[in-house]
Amino acid sequence: MNISNKKIILHDMCLRDGMHAKRHQISLAEMTQLATALDDAGVPLIEVTHGDGLGGNSVNYGFAAHSDEEYLSTVIPLMKQAKISALLLPGIGTVDHLRMAHELGVSTIRVAAQCTEADVTEQHISLSRQLGLDTVGFLMMAHMLEPKALLEQAKLMESYGANCIYCTDSAGYMLQDDVFERISVLRDGLKPDTQIGFHGHHNLALGVANSLTAVEAGAERIDGSAAGLGAGAGNTPLEVFNAVATRMGASTDVDVFKLMAAAEEIVVPMMDQAIRVDRDSLVLGYAGVYSSFLLHAKRAAEKYGVPSEAILLKLGQMKTVGGQEDMIEDVAINLAKSR
């Protein structure tokens, strides 16, 4: 593998994907402390919203400690060099949420959809570009589509105005060959000036390896979280990826040791439980289950007295996707009845 002299844009997920691991209960003080540390380390992009994106505060997805407006208005004025991004899932977030984020100073909007449903993003991607924002099409659960079919969905997002397309391994299911094939096809099939990104989860302990493979295949943006704070077994641990990529001769412009310090001294003490590859998160990666289902499944398992891994395996067999959180309890009830 040769990634020497490649320029990589790192994007930290602690304050968005990390919300899942914190049951969306990150305080404003914690958010401020971590965001300023990441900014000081040179991380160029930091995502800040509810775990399920703008408008995610709900019974279905969980109520955060604060509103998106409070989080964004607290963090954005403190940034010296980092830009703040926000995730938006059509059907959860609306164009009004998008406008609110723009007015508060968000620089990047990432419009996310199930990898087969890019057509639902047209309104939001188009508006984001009209507002002059860095606009990302975020294709979730990308393992569920073959590379050429994924490219067709990516081309739709590109046609709506997205200047960057993400291959998103929401389940932490992909192996390195899966990543290489998809990123290569996207790089070859999209416009040369359309950037490619990769978002990994560490459910099979492949977050770093898959992200390096993505860079080798042509990805320029890489998502991760300091100390891996995120759904499932966490996102690609950003401080580890940064150290490895730097050793391999790539350029991130992120201070290796300051990012390590942010992970060790700020993120780890924030954790409600250790972010690691345990049995349940390994099942997520093995069965291809949406990573943010993990804590929902654990709660349903406790409530109905059934093994959480049985719930997750069934969800994988059903090929459930993000947005179907209500089915987790249905599966648990049916498993309890069948015992």
From Swiss-Prot:
InterPro entries: 2-IPM_HCS-like, 4OH_2_O-val_aldolase, Aldolase_TIM, DmpG_comm, DRE_TIM_HOA, PYR_CT
Residue numbers annotated as active site: H20
Class of this enzyme: lyase
Alphabetical UniProt keywords: Aromatic hydrocarbons catabolism, Lyase, Manganese, Metal-binding
GO-annotated biological processes: catabolic process; L-leucine biosynthetic process
GO molecular function annotations of the record: 2-isopropylmalate synthase activity; 4-hydroxy-2-oxovalerate aldolase activity; manganese ion binding
Top-level taxon of the source organism: Bacteria
Domain Pyruvate carboxyltransferase: 8-260
Its EC number(s): 4.1.3.39
Similarity field: Belongs to the 4-hydroxy-2-oxovalerate aldolase family.
The name this protein goes by in its record: 4-hydroxy-2-oxovalerate aldolase
